[in-house]
């Protein structure tokens, strides 16, 4: 296996891509980015943890609804969703980004909770907002939206008009007349 610290060259589109733990990698704005397949995602992140990446700083998703043909390293096929994970090594003062493609017709990935317990809320938020299911997550329930909410608001095909807006009483300054609230 290749150590993550050793892959430090930018990969031109026509060159053979560099590999980190069997996953395509490249530099993006000076940061190493690893693109594992969905099937290798958990193994690659586990190997990066063994390389000294002690903390998962962030886990989120991007919906590329109309941009599945965006520029990616050779060997990486774009999908509608991309889960982005940022890892940090305190001892070596290094960061690495993991970007995994997730198809629209089966939006699921293994949970990182067993490796990084701090991802519990991040995976729940990604599930709540994008509908990506993290298998083996201990409590994959909504975290931001009400339990009975339909849909996933950060998906690009989620209709904005579907969001109900509730106007309850608007506070008025004392002495403005009409009572304490208006309706």
Regions found by a protein language model. Name each.
Residues 1-183:
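Terminal low-complexity/charged segments
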């Amino acid at each position: 296996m290749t150590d993550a610290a050793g892959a430090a060259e930018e990969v031109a589109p026509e060159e053979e891509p560099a590999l980190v733990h069997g996953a395509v990698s490249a530099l993006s704005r000076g940061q190493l980015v690893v693109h594992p397949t969905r099937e290798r995602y958990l193994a690659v992140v586990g190997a990066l943890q063994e390389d000294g990446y002690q903390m998962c700083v962030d886990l989120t998703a991007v919906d590329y609804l109309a941009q599945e043909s965006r520029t990616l390293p050779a060997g990486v096929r774009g999908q509608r969703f991309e889960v982005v994970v940022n890892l940090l090594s305190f001892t070596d003062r290094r960061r690495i980004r993991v970007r995994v493609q997730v198809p629209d017709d089966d939006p699921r990935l293994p949970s990182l909770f067993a490796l990084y317990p701090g991802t519990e809320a991040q995976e729940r938020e990604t599930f709540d907002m994008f509908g990506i299911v993290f298998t083996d997550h201990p409590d994959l329930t909504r975290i931001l939206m009400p339990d009975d909410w339909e849909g996933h608001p950060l998906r690009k095909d989620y209709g904005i008009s579907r969001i109900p807006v509730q106007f309850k009483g608007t506070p008025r300054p004392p002495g403005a007349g009409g009572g304490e609230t208006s309706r």
